[in-house]
Amino acid sequence: MNNAFLGYYIGVEVDTLWFHATRVAEERREGRALVLLAETNDPLGHRMEIRLEPKAPGVITTSARVVPGSGPLASFARVAGAGFEAAPGERYLGFGERSNAADQTGREVFSWAEEGPFSSGAADDLLRPLLPEFTFPTGPAATNLPIPWTVTTRGFGVLIDQPHRSTFHLASDRNDAWRLEAEAGHLDFTVFAGPTPAKALRRYSEYAGRQPKPAPWFFGPWFQPTLEGRPFELADRFRKEDVPVSVVQTYTHYLPCGDHRGREQQERERIRGYHSRGYRITTYFNPHVCTDYGEAYGEAAARGFFIRNMLGRPYVLSNPFTADERVSEIDFTNPEAARFWQRLLDDAIDAGYDGWMEDFGEYTPTDSVAADGSGGLELHNRYPVLYHCASYEHTRKRMGRDAAIFVRSGFHGIQRCARIVWGGDPTEDWSCADGLCAAVHQTLSTGLSGIAYWGSDIGGFHALVNPRTDDELNARWLEFGAFSGIMRTQANGLSLLSSRADRSQVWHPAVMPIWRRYTKLRTRLAPYIQAASRTYQRRGLPITRHLALVFPRDARAVAQQEEFMFGPDLLVAPVIEKGARERSLYLPRGRWVDVWRSLAYRERSGAFRLGRATLLRGRREVT
């Protein structure tokens, strides 16, 4: 049915039949907007109203609506779409945070905020021959942070500018056209001119908003202690052994269940202890409230502050990993509910925390109802933006720039409210489904979507059906993490087959020297990273840059998916294969210096010394 979707059609789907505009019957001006009334190939005579309006230099919005004729088309139109011509060799980048690839050419990419994808781990050898792209829960395109946006290598970008579930068909069913579709009876999209991918991205990031200016200490190394009874032991050890670390991550769950209650004095003493040692410290929140968090749940339920079910009652969700934890979700479309939730944040702010993990946001049920009348299908993708922006507006007033709040969920518009994005809960493996390789794709795709301050769970989080992170994987992930927007390690996680004791940690003997080396290097790079951050604030160019943003006319550079520029001058090619002791990479045009052969590291002092540099010629592959 989609063969009629050529590279210049716009139309709607009714009961699996597509109808598209055929010719312009009328046109008129409404202010700056051009409004077209187009005839369609629908035999019942329905027409389409198409509105084009400039929003900024090089930015044009397009809205398409059905004008009813004599039949049921307007009532039953369920999908609207538009087609574009595909040029030979054109590539499609962006789409928010994506694990499976940075370049989605030839694929279908949907936008729906959800958990995943999770790697099949130890079951991979069994599943891969049968299901080549098998990943939990809904396949390789699953993501916590979809953005229905693409920047193409032809030098322009397109945003599906509505919250409904949408899909890009990227030359996946015909090589001369690509199209976009929204699961709604109308279509809103915005086009951003180039002429280069970097220029189109700049326009998009001006339109969507850029991440708030970070505090300098965000860019230092982060670590998570695991010694609950001895909270300062690792922090003191790192200071003693000359390992520079800026942030300590702790996870008292202020929400959903109010785990801080009865521990307030202990919390304050721990915070003071880390602060006195020169560390910043974070904790944990999510947008849910446990049904047994008496005073908080009772007030919120009585005042209508939760997302409701079809009967008008608080929608109660169950945690799939904790059977006895039942929660309801704050309704951020209600300003009073947002203010109630902000008061809960004050418990951690008043205790002295410097930030927190702001978890979840992807669970709004499709059959729920919000205070503003939105149904779950429309609210689902909007919810994480409303959630994180409620937090940002409050912490901006209470804490200024010194609020290290890191989020995993989002949608278009999240950029202006997400101080830090982390890549969700990756699998503790090497895979491009959800492991280390996937993290490289994530940093590139988020950067191409207007996000600069991003970091992964170094070492991974999930080990559902696979072994825990070993020393080799931990070391390689550390190397990659040192060249991410945020360098943040993970020490815990979720495993069904083994315990935390089986997991490699950065302070273990085999990894500690590597941890020290890369924290020292990261700290030495602080002025360079902060300069790259200022470039992002001015121009929207991310810290980790897909080569298409820097070398748009070099076809071989544009094709790379597992190497990137870190800031303006460093080309990074992480080792992402188990057992590898070398890897090849493509050097784009220009002259290059091999840092590792030109920079000497002294283990005893932790100092780096510049040695003799040999220039390498670009436009070729090296090992």
At which residue positions do the language-model features occur?
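Catalytic and substrate-binding clefts that recognize carbohydrates or anionic sugar/phosphate headgroups
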Residues: M1-P216, W222-L227, A235-K240, F411, ...
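Catalytic core of carbohydrate-active enzymes
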Residues: N3-F5, V12-E13, Y392-A404, G410-G423, ...
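Beta-sheet entry/capping signal
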Residues: G58-S63, P148-W149, G155-G157, D188, ...
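Active-site-proximal helices and loops of the catalytic beta/alpha 8
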Residues: P72, A86, T252, R263-T322, ...
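Short, solvent-exposed turn/loop segments enriched in Gly/Ser/Thr/Pro and often Arg
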Residues: Q162, F223, Q249-Y254, F285-D292, ...
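Aromatic-lined carbohydrate-binding/catalytic grooves of carbohydrate-active enzymes
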Residues: K213-S374, Q415
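Extracellular glycoside hydrolase catalytic/binding regions
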Residues: I420-V440
